[in-house]
């Protein structure tokens, strides 16, 4: 056979690894074998054409057997209660995605080692084998794995989504089958005669639910927050509407000029009519309590101190504007009290007083009132009963009308006149004392008490700038109800006596 020229085609070389062709090994292979026999470390052999063909066959076989189906990729919940989260095993995810070193390629994923209880739980679900229970397994968050599959492995994610849909469809089918079996097992039939009764029960339960819902709306969810205006909307209150005839405006509702006719007029009480000069006036004109007469000098106070009580009983008027009666022996005290009385009268003129309706309610005594009776009461100061006071003498106790406090009048430094007065109305102790005008117990530092009846008053409620010094008597005690004095008729028909 002639030698082949340079342009001739080379004959195909038989593979060295073919067992049918006993070809001699190359010198390089002999050297490597000798080196291995000599005890030197073996070197990695470069693959020839025959080795490459063998590796191709082996890799194709590995690929055919290394395919991991999406059905085997399990997502589980741990802990299995309501607080659990969904996880996947890193080993299953790496096999499904075909990533050898999954942890090195994706180090940012959140991962944790499985606990022994978690491995037993997965073993009961047939997710892992007994051999895998002894190995170290790693769990990944399922949401992070799904996001990774969507971004980098869309084909794998589509395949896995199909499997999830099939599992959900199968779950619904199984649930429907169980329900159908339960319906078949319950062969009990409803009698036609009991249908109206069942309808009534259902309507009653619906009515109860609706009533509870409406009550909850009215009591707990009345207001709501408007997202557009950022305003809390509250339902408008219901108002009583008067009939039309009660709200109809008359032809002359109010006078536009003085003396013009109007249908509005004031109704006077019989007591007020007795003071009016309508030719039938029965009482003399009363003094104005808002503008009392001022004292000219301090001597008049000293002269009137002795007979002040008798004059107040006869006239029913006060000697000072604030009701501050001075009983001091020295002239400087009386002059100081006189100056205070004048200053208080100026304050009264500048400060609007309370209306007369509130003051008219204040009376010296409550008709038919009986003080409280506590049999085994003890004095809050000496801690003794009515058998003996702090001086060892028998003395009856006085009791607060609002609490259980009691006390001896001698322990409270009360006179017999004061005790007889406080028994005529609901008396209050120092802890329960309230203002007679406003009825509030606050501002104790501005609370003062009458020396005759022990009632409490705020300084600002009676028009005083500060608590007066010395003896103070309230308007209720110093302005006794006037004794009407009848006078003769005035006018043409009046007879002169």
From Swiss-Prot:
One Pfam match: PHD
Superkingdom field: Eukaryota
Biased composition (Basic and acidic residues): 344-358
Keyword field contains rRNA-binding: no
Segments for region (Disordered): 1-61, 284-367
Region feature (Essential to induce neural progenitor proliferation): 88-184, 291-333
Keywords for this protein: Isopeptide bond, Metal-binding, Neurogenesis, Nucleus, Phosphoprotein, Repeat, Transcription, Transcription regulation, Ubl conjugation, Zinc, Zinc-finger
Stretches with biased composition (Polar residues): 317-327
Region (SAY): 88-294
Similarity-based family: Belongs to the SAYP family.
Function: Involved in transcription activity regulation by chromatin remodeling. Belongs to the neural progenitors-specific chromatin remodeling complex (npBAF complex) and is required for the proliferation of neural progenitors. During neural development a switch from a stem/progenitor to a post-mitotic chromatin remodeling mechanism occurs as neurons exit the cell cycle and become committed to their adult state. The transition from proliferating neural stem/progenitor cells to post-mitotic neurons requires a switch in subunit composition of the npBAF and nBAF complexes.
Protein name: PHD finger protein 10
């Amino acid at each position: 056979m002639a030698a082949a020229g340079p342009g001739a085609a080379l004959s195909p070389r038989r593979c060295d690894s073919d067992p049918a062709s006993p070809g001699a090994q190359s010198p390089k292979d002999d050297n490597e074998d000798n080196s291995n026999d000599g005890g030197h470390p073996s070197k990695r052999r470069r693959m020839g054409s025959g080795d490459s063909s063998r590796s191709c066959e082996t890799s194709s076989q590995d690929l055919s057997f290394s395919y991991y189906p999406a059905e085997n990729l399990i997502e589980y919940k741990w802990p299995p209660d309501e607080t659990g989260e969904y996880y996947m095993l890193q080993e299953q995810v790496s096999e499904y995605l075909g990533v050898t070193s999954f942890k090195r390629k994706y180090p940012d994923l959140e991962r944790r080692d499985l606990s022994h209880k978690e491995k037993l739980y997965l073993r009961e679900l047939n997710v892992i084998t007994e051999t895998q229970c002894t190995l170290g397994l790693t769990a990944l968050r399922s949401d992070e794995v799904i996001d990774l599959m969507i971004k980098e492995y869309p084909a794998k994610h589509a395949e896995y989504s199909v499997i999830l849909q099939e599992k959900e469809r199968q779950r619904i089918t199984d649930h429907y089958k169980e329900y159908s079996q339960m319906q078949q097992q319950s062969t009990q039939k409803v009698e036609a005669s009991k249908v109206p009764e069942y309808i009534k029960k259902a309507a009653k339960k619906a009515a109860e639910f609706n009533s509870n819902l409406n009550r909850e709306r009215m009591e707990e969810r009345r207001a709501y927050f408007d997202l557009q205006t950022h305003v809390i909307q509250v339902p408008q209150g219901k108002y009583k509407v008067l009939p039309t005839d009660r709200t109809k405006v008359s032809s002359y509702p109010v006078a536009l000029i003085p003396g013009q006719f109007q249908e509005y007029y004031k109704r006077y009480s019989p007591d007020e009519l007795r003071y009016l000069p309508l030719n039938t006036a029965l009482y003399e004109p009363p003094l104005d309590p808002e503008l009392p007469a001022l004292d000219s000098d301090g001597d008049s106070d000293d002269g009137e101190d002795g007979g002040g009580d008798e004059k107040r009983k006869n006239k029913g008027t006060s000697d000072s504007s604030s009701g501050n009666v001075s009983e001091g022996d020295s002239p400087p005290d009386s002059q100081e009290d006189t100056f205070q009385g004048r200053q208080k009268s100026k304050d009264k003129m500048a400060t609007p007083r309370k209306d007369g309706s509130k003051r008219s309610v204040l009376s010296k005594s409550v008709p038919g009132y009986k003080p409280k009776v506590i049999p085994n009461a003890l004095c809050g100061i000496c801690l003794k009963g009515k058998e003996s006071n702090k001086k060892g003498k028998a003395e009856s106790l006085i009791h607060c009308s609002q609490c259980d406090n009691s006390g001896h009048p001698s322990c409270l430094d009360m006179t017999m006149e004061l005790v007889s007065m406080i028994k005529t109305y609901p008396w209050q102790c120092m802890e329960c004392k309230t203002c007679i005008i406003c009825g509030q117990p606050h501002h104790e530092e501005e609370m003062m008490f009458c020396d005759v009846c022990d009632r409490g008053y705020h300084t600002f409620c009676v028009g005083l700038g500060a608590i007066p010094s010395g003896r103070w008597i309230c308007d209720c005690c110093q302005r006794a109800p006037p004794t009407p004095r009848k006078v003769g008729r005035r006018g043409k028909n009046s007879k002169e006596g």
